């Protein structure tokens, strides 16, 4: 029953996306960020029940199959144009497979709020990817905003955000590096998806996501079979695994991935990444609610400075016409 309601909710969201100049579109962006921020806590719960690569592959394959089923019910075309084959494969490997594998491995030793804050680096990587892939101009005003936000980001990341200021220290370890790599690859993937949506209008964003999820899921399961112990499957708590995977598929893969992809037709990936800077606050809430994690007091300060820095960028985005334009 919950799954049916969530799917109906996702369909309702999709009908509202193509009104880029109304308040509803902005509301959907922040609603999407609120829902998506729960995925960090849900992912940690899933990894308590099963191996990380198996979790990644299972959710991706299941979500892709569900999306294909929805497309078949709507009788949408699933034929891949020849020019779209290699970009979709590239999107699958970089934007879905590598991003999710690195994220899940890094999450094993990071709190959900810290991991989500590291993903706050995405506006900067998205701006760079948009410049390289879409030839979107980066002005001096944008660079100033990037610099201000980047300084705030690095101060928090390197010196920590623990409750006791005296405990702050160098905290750039392997988990943080994995999450940073996942952030960069994610930004590249979203920019590639936006570029692909422009070039292949005959193929819906949902269909592109479905293909990418299935391919990435199969790669993750193969990776899991090679590196993780299957006896018969790498699941320790089947009930918790099914609950966490079900929630991840519905909220992250079916609702958030597809809504974000739809929004990319009307907003730049840089602007959407900027709006997602509120996600660490939401993730802290879900981490407290679902996992009993404490709220790091330095997080609010760091996010505030990142938002101030990024405001400079988005004044330029509006002026240049990259935001709130129909495509």
Swiss-Prot record:
Keywords: Cell membrane, Membrane, Repeat, Transmembrane, Transmembrane helix, Transport
Cystines in this chain: none
InterPro entries: AA-Vitamin_Transporters, EamA_dom
This protein's GO CC annotations: plasma membrane
EamA domain residues: 34-157, 189-313
Cellular localisation: Cell membrane
Transmembrane segments: 22-42, 53-73, 85-105, 114-134, 143-163, 165-185, 202-222, 240-260, 271-291, 294-314
Recorded topology in the membrane: Multi-pass membrane protein
Top-level taxon in the UniProt lineage: Bacteria
Xref: Pfam families: EamA (PF00892)
Activity regulation: CCCP treatment reduces SAM intracellular uptake by 50%.
UniProt similarity note: Belongs to the drug/metabolite transporter (DMT) superfamily. 10 TMS drug/metabolite exporter (DME) (TC 2.A.7.3) family.
Purpose of the protein: Transports S-adenosylmethionine (SAM) and S-adenosylhomocysteine (SAH). Allows bacteria to acquire SAM from the eukaryotic host cell and to likely remove the toxic by-product SAH.
Name by which UniProt lists this protein: S-adenosylmethionine/S-adenosylhomocysteine transporter
Protein source organism: Chlamydia trachomatis serovar L2 (strain ATCC VR-902B / DSM 19102 / 434/Bu)
